[in-house]
């Protein structure tokens, strides 16, 4: 299809007329109508770049890349040039960039130095219906900009999900509704029953395939999916010829379902493609390719395919009705990744994926009664997430009345209190909520407050392990690089064992970093060791950018100090996750109890009285992830003010918060005087980093 034939471009005159009469407009249209790619071009052709850049925010890195590439090709140019993009640790813009695609976090960073966005004529907030925390914060800040700049324009781009809330927020601004031709989609409610005869008639009879299938924790789900595909391929449904889109809650279930389909009786007729956020750009773009002749494309996706990705040719949608959603507890500073039923609006977005190019069918793997009991819209992220980073950025902008900031949806008071407490534990805020010197230093890094705080601690107190602390921050900024392919778990764990260190995961990260960075053939290294190359390359890139930030501050990047100093620096940022053992395999932090070390940790089933964790997450139980051991003396070095409280957790003695360090030094458990290894198992010498500037 010619992009100019898309519904959005066809309504160019309506959009520009509304924008000429209003500072803010909401553009609402279905996914796939061209909002993301055609609105920037419409603005560029209308001359909006003459008085400043056209800024487009995206909630995801992968969209930032693909959108900038698509728009550049449509304008017959290359990136960077007239079109450029910017995201965390990656700036691909040029002096003549007129259309700037950026992650929403980048716009927040830029507003720190230019609160009224003087270099922009217009900002388009794309995918606003997702209501991420950054999107809500951006909308609040942009509202302040239009109060000062009469020449500034805002477009809020939304799929057909509650666009009225944006109009009300911006003083009843107009909503430009643009319909896209949609074909009818039949809905079939086909609820999952408990697994009984576990899909034996759909699975090939090899022992290996049966083992893959029976290991799954979602046998009934996969049985239902196989039965629907069986009916579709036999021609026993009303489905038009076309491809299949399956919505599943997470990466794990997608991989398991992929294995089931690839070992089914229909495997030779299916072109199965996974789609989730952690995949690289090239892997994600496979979903847009046509299947090989004689095959049907089956895309198995998370909710990323609801509104962020448009896949033509889908005629059958199989909707589990589930998504994995993060919920944060501000009282315990812990997160929970919960598989939860999606809202009615999300269900309907999924259904609509089947009717873009021809009539379709949506199989809902839940009952009509279940659907009718669901909430109309998803819970906004601001009501279920950690607010400490947003509050830190607000303080940086001089906004200290957190409770009365004009968010489109007010966050819970408990969430604000918890975020303030978290920032106070990191020494980031003064009593009047202005930034302390430590808080100001933290803001130099585009990281979560806990990660920037560990870097600041290394700068101020442990300069000899600054490089190692930057590596730790890079690892905690990404997903796990360890891969456990179904059916190869034993081999993968044996490979990962090569990087294990008795001082826990944070020491193991250093070994893995050194081994990967020194590997000549990084692809082969990752294949041999069951590691995710894209994640490790991302870690290298983050480390390089953190090096640049620190160097720009005029601070030398030391390395090779003691393992104890390294763990102290890391633990100061992670003070919320310093825990004491309270029984066999059980730990408590200052705010959470009944914490177990995750089985994937080096420290699983290891004996330690005190530990530090990169995060504490509730899944089936409360788990500490990324764990290393600590000694009593280290606890005093990490936080003299909180040391007595933390140690009392081990002793089970109630004690008030200590305001000063005790003179006594408890007997050490684990030595913190050893030095970081000079040589890893890979033979790479651990040395000071010579920065290539």
Residue ranges of predicted features:
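P-loop NTPase motor module signature
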Residues: 1-454, 461, 547-555, 560, ...
């Amino acid at each position: 299809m010619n992009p100019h034939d898309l519904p959005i471009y066809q309504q160019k005159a309506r959009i520009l007329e509304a924008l000429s009469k209003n500072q803010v407009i909401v553009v609402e249209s279905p996914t796939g109508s061209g909002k993301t790619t055609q609105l920037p071009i419409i603005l560029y052709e209308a001359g909006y770049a003459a008085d400043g850049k056209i800024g487009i925010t995206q909630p995801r890195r992968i969209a930032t890349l693909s959108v900038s590439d698509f728009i550049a090709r449509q304008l017959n140019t290359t990136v960077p040039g007239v079109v450029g993009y910017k995201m965390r640790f990656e700036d691909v813009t040029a002096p003549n960039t007129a259309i700037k695609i950026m992650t929403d976090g980048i716009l927040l960073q830029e507003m720190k130095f230019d609160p009224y966005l003087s270099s922009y004529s217009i900002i388009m907030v794309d995918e606003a219906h997702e209501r991420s925390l950054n999107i809500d914060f951006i909308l609040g800040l942009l509202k302040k900009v239009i109060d000062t700049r009469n020449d500034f324009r805002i477009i809020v781009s939304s799929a057909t999900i509650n666009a009225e809330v944006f109009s009300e927020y911006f003083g009843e601004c107009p909503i430009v509704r643009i319909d896209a031709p949609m074909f009818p989609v039949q809905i079939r409610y086909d609820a999952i029953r408990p697994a009984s005869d576990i899909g034996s008639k759909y699975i090939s009879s090899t022992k290996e395939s049966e083992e893959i299938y029976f290991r799954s924790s979602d046998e009934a789900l996969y049985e239902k999916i196989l039965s629907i595909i069986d009916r579709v391929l036999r021609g026993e449904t009303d489905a038009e010829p076309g491809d299949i889109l399956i919505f599943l809650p997470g990466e794990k279930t997608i991989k398991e379902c992929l294995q089931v389909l690839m070992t089914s009786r229909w495997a030779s007729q299916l072109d199965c493609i996974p789609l989730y956020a952690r995949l690289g750009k090239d892997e994600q773009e496979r979903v847009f390719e046509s299947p090989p002749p004689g095959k049907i494309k089956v895309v198995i996706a998370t909710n990323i395919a609801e509104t962020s990705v448009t896949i033509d040719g889908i005629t059958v949608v199989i909707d589990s009705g589930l998504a994995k959603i993060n919920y944060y507890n501000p009282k315990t500073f812990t997160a929970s990744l919960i598989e939860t039923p999606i809202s009615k609006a999300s269900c309907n977005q999924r259904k609509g994926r089947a009717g873009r190019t021809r009539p379709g069918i949506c199989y809902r793997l839940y009952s009509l009664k279940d659907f009718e009991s669901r909430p109309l819209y998803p819970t906004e992220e601001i009501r279920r997430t950690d607010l400490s980073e947003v509050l830190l950025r607000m303080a940086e902008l001089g906004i200290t009345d957190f409770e009365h900031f004009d968010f489109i949806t007010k966050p819970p008071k408990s969430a604000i209190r918890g975020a303030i407490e978290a920032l106070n534990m990191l020494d980031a805020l003064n009593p009047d909520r202005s930034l302390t010197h430590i808080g100001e230093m933290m803001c130099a890094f585009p990281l979560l407050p806990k990660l920037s705080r560990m870097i600041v601690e290394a700068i101020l107190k442990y300069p000899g392990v600054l490089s190692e602390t930057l590596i730790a921050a890079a690892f905690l900024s990404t997903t796990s690089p360890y891969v456990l392919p179904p059916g190869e778990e034993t081999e993968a764990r044996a490979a990962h064992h090569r990087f294990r260190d008795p001082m826990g995961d944070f020491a193991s990260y250093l070994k893995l970093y050194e081994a990967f960075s020194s590997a000549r053939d990084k692809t082969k290294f990752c294949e041999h060791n069951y590691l995710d190359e894209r994640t490790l390359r991302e870690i290298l890139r983050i480390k390089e950018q953190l090096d640049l930030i620190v160097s720009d501050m005029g601070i030398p990047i030391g390395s090779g100090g003691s393992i104890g100093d390294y763990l102290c620096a890391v633990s100061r940022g992670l003070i919320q996750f310093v825990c004491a053992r309270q029984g066999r395999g059980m730990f408590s932090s200052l705010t959470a109890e009944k914490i177990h070390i995750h089985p994937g940790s080096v420290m699983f089933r290891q004996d330690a009285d005190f530990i530090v964790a990169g995060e504490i997450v509730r899944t089936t139980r409360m788990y500490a992830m990324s764990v290393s051991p600590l000694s009593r003396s280290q606890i005093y070095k990490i936080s003299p003010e909180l040391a007595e409280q933390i140690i009392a957790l081990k002793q089970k003695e109630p004690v008030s918060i200590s305001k000063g360090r005790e003179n006594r030094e408890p007997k050490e458990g684990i030595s913190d005087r050893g030095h970081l290894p000079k040589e890893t198992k890979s033979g790479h010498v651990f040395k000071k980093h010579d920065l290539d500037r």
